[in-house]
């Protein structure tokens, strides 16, 4: 993966990109520490703006993070613990999707290499129906199109699956139900197209 700041600099556009990061999902939600990377000129501008926007950063929280993580190696080790907890959940969802939907050509997904979500693309015009059917059956999903600005997916096809919270047993049942909702919504769309 190319490092975008260096690539922009090489291309003569060093001020084009701002990169943001947060420990919010690493340490504890709502109290994470944010970080930003940008060109020297952009960082100078940001510092000038922050002088008048922020009276003082939460230094106690910053200290708490430094004491807990110590350095980048501490963060890496902590993230490995997260991976050990989350990996089986992601593997389970992907296995059920492969088993129930693989080869049917009514949806596609990518096995993520990190992160907290699986991006699922249904047939165009089906995402909202899938999410609604799942909710009616007792499985609450992230809103259809949540990955798009203002939640407006022009194809009504994208669903963000978040397997991090439910226990593994519940996750299997929920994913099977999700797959059933994908099948039902897809059949409804395809039959409607035949009219």
What is each residue range found by the language model?
Residues 17, 107, 139:
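Short, conserved active-site loop motifs that form the nucleotide-linked donor/cofactor pocket
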Residues 21-24, 106-107, 145-150:
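Short, solvent-exposed loop/turn elements at beta->coil junctions and helix N-caps
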Residues 13, 136, 151-195:
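PLP-dependent enzyme catalytic core of the Aspartate aminotransferase-like
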